[in-house]
Every structure is written in structure tokens, then in C-alpha cells.
Amino acid sequence: MARVKRGVIARARHKKVLKAAKGYYGARSRVYRVAFQAVVKAAQYAYRDRRQRKRQFRQLWIARINAAARQNGLSYSKFINGLKKASVEIDRKILADIAVFDKVAFAALVAKAKSAL
């Protein structure tokens, strides 16, 4: 059986990792062993933060809706409860968008929520 030298495979693997670590500071972009650890850690952060991003956007939407609802004399929880009772099915993303860009329409939604309470 022929002897297999792994130089080509190893170089390709190292090249792949160093390419992924491009732009990292110092040894993290130059030394394979350090770069590999940095790339793995970056992937872990990316995985975690893809899930966190969803939570953070929901928090942002709720904060915006709460601020706009309070300007119209209603707390966030009462506003959402009123919308549910009035059977208005608009999600928080759209509500936050309306609160920021169309204050008149949001005031109408608040009035509808108040009447349902």
C-alpha cells in the first residue's frame, strides 16, 4: 500500500481556518493554533447571538410600544390586553413600526384598546 503524505490536506485545512480568521488581531490571524481557537469561539458567539438577536428585537419593540402607549395614557400591558380583547391581531414588530412612523394610527389603536377594556 502506498504511503499517504498529508501535506496537501493539512495545508488546505490550515488555509481554510486562516481565511476565516482574516481581520483578527495579532496571532489570531497568523498562527494556526491560535486562529483555530478564535474561529471556533467566533462560531460559538455567532450561534448564541443569532438566538439572542430575536430576544433583543422583541425587547426593543416592547420598549417602543410601551413608550408610545404611555404617551397616549395607557401602559404596555393594558394596551396589549385591550388589543387582545378587541381582537386586533397585529404583532409587536408591526405595532412598534406604527408607533414610530404613524403616530395617528397608533393613537387610533390605543383608543380601540381603551374601548375594549
From Swiss-Prot:
Molecular-function annotations in GO: rRNA binding; structural constituent of ribosome
Gene3D superfamilies linked: 6.10.160.10, Ribosomal protein L20
Keyword Protease: no
A Gene Ontology cellular-component term: ribosome
Alphabetical keyword list: Ribonucleoprotein, Ribosomal protein, RNA-binding, rRNA-binding
Keyword rRNA-binding annotated: yes
Domain of life, per lineage: Bacteria
Pfam family, one: Ribosomal_L20
Gene Ontology BP terms: ribosomal large subunit assembly; translation
PANTHER family in UniProt: 39S RIBOSOMAL PROTEIN L20
Entry similarity comment: Belongs to the bacterial ribosomal protein bL20 family.
Function field: Binds directly to 23S ribosomal RNA and is necessary for the in vitro assembly process of the 50S ribosomal subunit. It is not involved in the protein synthesizing functions of that subunit.
Entry protein name: Large ribosomal subunit protein bL20
